[in-house]
Design a protein with these regions (language model features):
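Alpha/propeptide regions of enzymes that mature by internal proteolysis
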Residues: 10-325
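Bacterial Sec-dependent N-terminal signal peptides
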Residues: 1-11
Length: 325
């Protein structure tokens, strides 16, 4: 009689990857101190999530904790310091999905919940719906006893100056969505996202954003749309996207990566690169994505000059980067 693996079950690989936006970022646009600030915050967020995984926490707990750190930082386009819509207000979107049961939750256009990702998580667990929007989503978050703030909490002086400048250029008949100067165009490509796989092999993906600077009031991008900006399936992968959301919606980018793996048998790297560098670019879409497959392999693919990103896994990967390298 042969007993195999009794008491020696192989521990699954754990991994976490995050992005904080893809866009027209070049080294000459940032001081050394600014680069250090970004890399420090990305590393901090990554390590908080990884520690949760390391201590037997779930991938869902890891993704939410990581995104909250990014939402609470004014460095990124999510939560406090996010970009502003045409009405000079923060209208934020977020979503989360578990690959184990494909349950998901999302909110769009929230203005009062301090951490939009927690509202999306509350929808996942405590609502029969997948997505809530606007004041109804804020009211739901408040009823769930999540931390609420005044809309002014999210507005920084820097973002207010940016929106005023863009509105003035709009009045001067500048086509902001096609001909914006590069100094401003990176504001269109915010978003933060996290994908993680825990010791149980469960994948979770989550995304949070302020959307597009000077967007029309109540515009909704890909971030809260399950299958477009966020997707997770334990059979294939978890994906979180960043970029010009309209293109990601049209291609259902996050789900497309999973579908290529499931139905064509492609590996993660081939699927992500094909979607980002072929399918997206064929229709003029700019941006990127992060992904983790069921084996814990990580992909960070983007077709812009840069993407704020970081990753860590139990197989030794430990990285943080901003620019194309």
């Amino acid at each position: 009689m042969c007993f195999i693996g009794i008491g020696h079950a192989q521990e699954r690989k754990i991994a976490i990857v995050l992005h904080a936006g893809a866009g027209y970022m070049r080294p000459d646009m940032y001081t050394k101190d600014q680069v250090q600030d970004y890399t420090d915050k990305l590393s901090e967020a990554r390590d908080v999530g990884y520690k949760i995984l390391e201590n037997d926490g779930t991938s869902e707990d890891a993704t939410v904790a990581t995104i909250k750190i990014l939402e609470n930082s004014t460095l990124f386009n999510a939560g406090k310091g996010c970009v502003l819509s045409h009405n000079k207000r923060a209208e934020m979107d977020a979503s989360i999905m578990n690959g184990s049961d494909k349950n998901a939750g999302a909110v769009a256009g929230v203005q009062r919940v301090k951490n939009p990702i927690t509202a999306a998580q509350a929808v996942l667990h405590n609502s029969p719906h997948v997505m809530l929007s606007g004041s109804g989503a804020d009211d739901f978050a408040e009823a769930q006893e999540l931390e609420m703030v005044a809309p002014s909490y999210f507005v920084t002086d820097e973002r207010m100056e940016q929106i005023k400048k863009m509105i003035q250029e709009e009045k001067n008949k500048t086509d902001l969505f096609r001909d914006a100067p590069e100094s401003l165009s990176d504001n269109k490509f915010g978003t933060v996202g996290v994908v993680a796989i825990d010791k149980q092999g469960n994948i979770c993906a989550a995304t949070s954003t302020g959307g597009m600077m000077n967007k029309k009031n109540n515009r909704i991008g890909d971030s809260p749309v399950i299958g477009a900006g966020t997707y997770a399936d334990n059979r294939s992968c978890g994906v979180s996207c960043t970029g010009h959301g309209e293109y990601f919606i049209r291609l259902a980018v996050a789900h497309e990566v999973s579908a290529l793996m499931l139905h064509r048998g492609w590996d993660l790297e081939k699927a992500t690169n094909y979607v980002v560098h072929k399918e997206l670019m064929d229709i003029g879409g700019a941006g990127g994505l992060i992904a983790i497959d069921r084996k814990g392999n990580i992909s960070m693919s983007f077709n812009t000059p840069g993407m704020f990103r970081a990753a860590r896994s139990s197989s030794g990967e430990n990285s943080v980067a901003i620019f194309s390298e």
